[in-house]
């Protein structure tokens, strides 16, 4: 947690100009903007977070690293009906700003001010109260199963988890459980990889495959093949084995998740907000049964504030 002075602290009574940000009081307002404006909104959010945290202290580098991710998720998904769960929650300042708590961030972690973490009693957009790591996938999966049982099969449930938190036992148990659901459960796991804890992808072919399998034609052909072969058990099982081995061969980083029988995409640039919107839209609009999805996103802690980028631990 950052609690010391920063370069912005000298302007104690002058908040950064946030022309676009002042027009956004909810994700519905955000969705009215053309996607090309989201980069400008990201810059304004970063300046605003730095300004606020320079006065109050708080989780700086974590929140700066997830600005584009928060923007893209609220832009693409129908929050709060679609459920968004932030693991730990210390990276959720942009999320709070976009969900009607912009002014409240000036008193984050202060007496009678905003919590430093998502809280269900603070906003309907905070689907799950967090602060401990490795809990998000379990929470989102539980919500997804409940929604399915209640007939809300179009509702998405998104867990945003870091590479460090993914090493927790509870996260591993949730991944293992999620792999049992092949259809009817709309679960998207965002792996926010900001510290290279997971081995980097091998070769350019991996990136090419990510582009290939994230296109609608790929999944339409995949689901068409399943529908044709489902009444021929021998051929259906053979096709499943061929598909799984092909993906594992071409995309080494996905092997961790294919072990759990999850659909892996990525890695992609977590600071390219237009690219994030494009990818999330494709995943949201995929047709047919496919089970839980993992999207691997690469980000930089402290993005946009050089001292925090160089020393993300101190400015955490």
Please place each PLM-identified region on the residue numbering.
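Short beta-strand segments
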Residues: 87, 160-161, 188-192, 296-301
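Short, positively charged and aromatic/hydrophobic N-terminal segments
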Residues: 1-12
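N-terminal amphipathic, basic-rich helices that act as targeting or association modules
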Residues: 15-99, 256-262, 266-278, 287, ...
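Cofactor-binding active-site loop characterized by glycine-rich and histidine/acidic residues
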Residues: 59-181
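A short alpha/beta connector and helix-capping loop motif
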Residues: 168-192, 205-214, 308
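Residue-level preference for the first positions of well-ordered beta-strands
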Residues: 156-158, 186-188, 290-294
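Long, well-ordered, tryptophan-enriched scaffold segments
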Residues: 195-316
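Structural signal for hydrophobic packing residues in well-ordered secondary-structure cores
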Residues: 45-49, 53, 73-81, 101-105, ...
């Amino acid at each position: 947690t950052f609690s010391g002075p920063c370069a912005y602290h000298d302007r104690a009574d002058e908040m950064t100009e946030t022309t676009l940000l002042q027009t956004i009081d909810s994700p519905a307002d955000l969705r009215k903007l053309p996607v090309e404006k989201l980069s400008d909104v990201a810059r304004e959010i970063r300046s605003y977070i730095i300004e606020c945290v320079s006065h109050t202290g708080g989780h700086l580098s974590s929140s700066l690293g997830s600005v584009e991710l928060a923007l893209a998720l609220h832009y693409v998904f129908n929050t709060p009906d679609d459920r968004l769960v932030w693991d730990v929650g210390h990276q959720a300042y942009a999320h709070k700003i976009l969900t009607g708590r912009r002014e409240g961030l000036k008193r984050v972690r202060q007496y009678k001010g905003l919590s430093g973490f998502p809280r269900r009693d603070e906003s309907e957009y905070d689907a799950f109260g967090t602060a401990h790591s490795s809990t998000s996938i379990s929470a989102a999966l539980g919500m997804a199963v409940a929604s399915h049982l209640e007939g809300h099969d179009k509702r998405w449930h998104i867990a945003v988890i870091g590479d460090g938190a993914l090493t927790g036992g509870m996260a591993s148990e949730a991944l293992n459980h999620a792999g049992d659901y092949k259809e009817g459960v709309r679960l998207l796991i965002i792996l926010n990889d900001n510290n290279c804890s997971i081995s980097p992808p091998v070769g350019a072919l991996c990136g090419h495959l990510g582009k290939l399998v994230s296109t609608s034609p790929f999944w339409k052909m995949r689901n068409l093949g399943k529908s044709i072969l489902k009444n021929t058990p021998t051929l259906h099982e053979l096709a499943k084995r061929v598909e799984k081995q092909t993906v594992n061969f071409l995309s080494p980083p996905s092997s961790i998740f294919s072990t759990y029988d999850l659909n892996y995409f990525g890695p992609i640039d977590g600071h390219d907000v237009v690219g994030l919107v494009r990818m999330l839209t494709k995943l949201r609009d995929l047709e047919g049964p496919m089970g839980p999805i993992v999207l691997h996103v690469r980000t930089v802690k402290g993005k946009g504030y050089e001292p925090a980028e160089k020393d993300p631990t101190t400015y955490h």
